[in-house]
C-alpha cells in the first residue's frame, strides 16, 4: 500500500474525529471515564488490529489511550492507517 502525501493525509483528516498528523504518524488521544474503560477499549482494539494485520502503537495513562498509526514498511501513513483510525473511532463510541 503506497504512502500517502501530506495533502492526501490532510484531506482524509477532515473525515476523522480529533486525529492529527504529527511526526509522520496519525495520532489521537482517546479519553475515557476511568481505567477500566481504557482497558476495555484496548481489548476491543486487539481483534480489529489483528483482522487488518496492522497494529498501532498504544500508550495508556489511566483514563487516556494515545494511539499512533503509521505503516512502517512504507515509511509513513497509508490507507490502512486511515482505515484503522476509522475503526478505532467506531470502537470509542462503544466504550462511552
Swiss-Prot record:
- Any idea of its EC number? 4.2.1.96
Q: Name one GO biological process term.
A: tetrahydrobiopterin biosynthetic process
What the entry lists under Pfam families is as follows: Pterin_4a
State the superkingdom.
Archaea
- Which reaction equation describes what this protein catalyses? (4aS,6R)-4a-hydroxy-L-erythro-5,6,7,8-tetrahydrobiopterin = (6R)-L-erythro-6,7-dihydrobiopterin + H2O
User: Using the chain's own numbering, where are the disulfide bonds?
Assistant: none
Which keywords accompany this UniProt record?
Lyase
Checking InterPro entries in the record gives:
PCD_sf, Pterin_deHydtase
A single Gene Ontology MF term assigned here is: 4-alpha-hydroxytetrahydrobiopterin dehydratase activity
Q: Indicate the enzyme's highest-level EC class.
A: lyase
Answer yes or no on keyword Transferase: no
**Alphabetical list of NCBIfam families matching this protein:** PRK00823.1-2
The family classification in the record reads: Belongs to the pterin-4-alpha-carbinolamine dehydratase family.
Q: What is this protein called?
A: Putative pterin-4-alpha-carbinolamine dehydratase
Species per Swiss-Prot/TrEMBL record: Metallosphaera sedula (strain ATCC 51363 / DSM 5348 / JCM 9185 / NBRC 15509 / TH2)
What lineage is this protein's organism placed in? Archaea, Thermoproteota, Thermoprotei, Sulfolobales, Sulfolobaceae
Amino acid at each position: 500500500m503506497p504512502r500517502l502525501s501530506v495533502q492526501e493525509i490532510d484531506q482524509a483528516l477532515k473525515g476523522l474525529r480529533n486525529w492529527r498528523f504529527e511526526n509522520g504518524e496519525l495520532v489521537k488521544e482517546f479519553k475515557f471515564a476511568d481505567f477500566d474503560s481504557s482497558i476495555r477499549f484496548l481489548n476491543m482494539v486487539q481483534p480489529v488490529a489483528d483482522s487488518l494485520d496492522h497494529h498501532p502503537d498504544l500508550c495508556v495513562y489511566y483514563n487516556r489511550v494515545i494511539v499512533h498509526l503509521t505503516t512502517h514498511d512504507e515509511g509513513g501513513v497509508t490507507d490502512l492507517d486511515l482505515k484503522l483510525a476509522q475503526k478505532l473511532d467506531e470502537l470509542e463510541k462503544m466504550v462511552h
